[in-house]
Amino acid sequence: MLWIWAVLPLVLAGSQLRVHTQGTNSISESLKLRRRVRETDKNCSEGLYQGGPFCCQPCQPGKKKVEDCKMNGGTPTCAPCTEGKEYMDKNHYADKCRRCTLCDEEHGLEVETNCTLTQNTKCKCKPDFYCDSPGCEHCVRCASCEHGTLEPCTATSNTNCRKQSPRNRLWLLTILVLLIPLVFIYRKYRKRKCWKRRQDDPESRTSSRETIPMNASNLSLSKYIPRIAEDMTIQEAKKFARENNIKEGKIDEIMHDSIQDTAEQKVQLLLCWYQSHGKSDAYQDLIKGLKKAECRRTLDKFQDMVQKDLGKSTPDTGNENEGQCLE
């Protein structure tokens, strides 16, 4: 009976040793497998890419990858890019093609070479426009010279105009010096005459503020949106949308829906803001939004349009006399 108790510890120790050995072997096999995977990643020859467990050939220009290859050195399943909308100009293994560049006619650009499956669109400045920076997205209208041209405008440089002679400048300065006091005297005379007329005619005392409503909070902006968009670049329209809390996903959706029509993209970006904002206080908030997006030129034109329309829409019998007093 005593020999059983003596042998039992030896049996248990042997069992634990076998379990430990099996666990060590399992870890060793896992490390070997990982090492083989890493070696497979590094074993792809130059020009091949790792597609699952295999080294695959890239897709050719004008195509995109649909599925990886099924054997080492094999060719993946590739599909052509969308003609006229997408391109790929080199060997690759991406599952998407690049989008073709659009030439914005509203900003002086026109197509030089159409987009193909293997080449992006090439844009150039329209006649009488130029751009002096690389990767140009906005061409500028060539200057017109009042005193003659030294060098004509080209696609990459503005017109070089002949400068005005010092003698002409002296004449101009003299005229300005004489005109300034005359204008001052004339304006003072008109104000005095206007004040007297208003005193004599009670009906004409109506303030000009009544002819142009002070509160434009409920002014409908629907008819102004296309005219505002026409004056903005697509970058300014996108910046306006971002600065006024339009989500990036919605901006991308609008850009994709009208991918070939820059003018429509700009209109839809502004309409998206207007629809989400509502009519109430839209006039004041649009002005704030344009300032925030640094669209000063567009803001000035918009205010001029509204001022002009409001002036026409409010007839008044005293307008003629009052208009002369606005100076």
From Swiss-Prot:
Extracellular side of membrane: 22-169
CDD domains in the cross-refs: Death_FAS_TNFRSF6, TNFRSF6
Region Interaction with CALM: start-end pairs: 222-246
Chief place of localization: membrane
Conditions for induction: Expression oscillates in a circadian manner in the liver with peak levels seen at CT12.
Membrane topology according to the record: Single-pass type I membrane protein
Record flagged with keyword Glycoprotein: yes
Glycosylation sites: N43, N114
Keyword set, alphabetical order: Apoptosis, Calmodulin-binding, Cell membrane, Disease variant, Disulfide bond, Glycoprotein, Lipoprotein, Membrane, Palmitate, Phosphoprotein, Receptor, Repeat, Signal, Transmembrane, Transmembrane helix
InterPro entries recorded: DEATH-like_dom_sf, Death_dom, Fas_rcpt, TNFR/NGFR_Cys_rich_reg, TNFRSF6_death, TNFRSF6_N
Residue ranges crossing the lipid bilayer per the database entry: 170-186
Modification sites for Phosphoserine: S217, S220
Region of interest called Interaction with HIPK3, as start-end residue ranges on this chain: 204-309
UniProt signal peptide: 1-21
Annotated lipid attachment (S-palmitoyl cysteine): C194
Residue span(s) of domain Death: 222-306
Tissue: Detected in various tissues including thymus, liver, lung, heart, and adult ovary.
Processing and modification events after translation: Palmitoylated. Palmitoylation by ZDHHC7 prevents the lysosomal degradation of FAS regulating its expression at the plasma membrane.
Functional note: Receptor for TNFSF6/FASLG. The adapter molecule FADD recruits caspase CASP8 to the activated receptor. The resulting death-inducing signaling complex (DISC) performs CASP8 proteolytic activation which initiates the subsequent cascade of caspases (aspartate-specific cysteine proteases) mediating apoptosis. FAS-mediated apoptosis may have a role in the induction of peripheral tolerance, in the antigen-stimulated suicide of mature T-cells, or both.
Notes on the domains: Contains a death domain involved in the binding of FADD, and maybe to other cytosolic adapter proteins.
Protein name: Tumor necrosis factor receptor superfamily member 6
Annotated organism of origin: Mus musculus (Mouse)
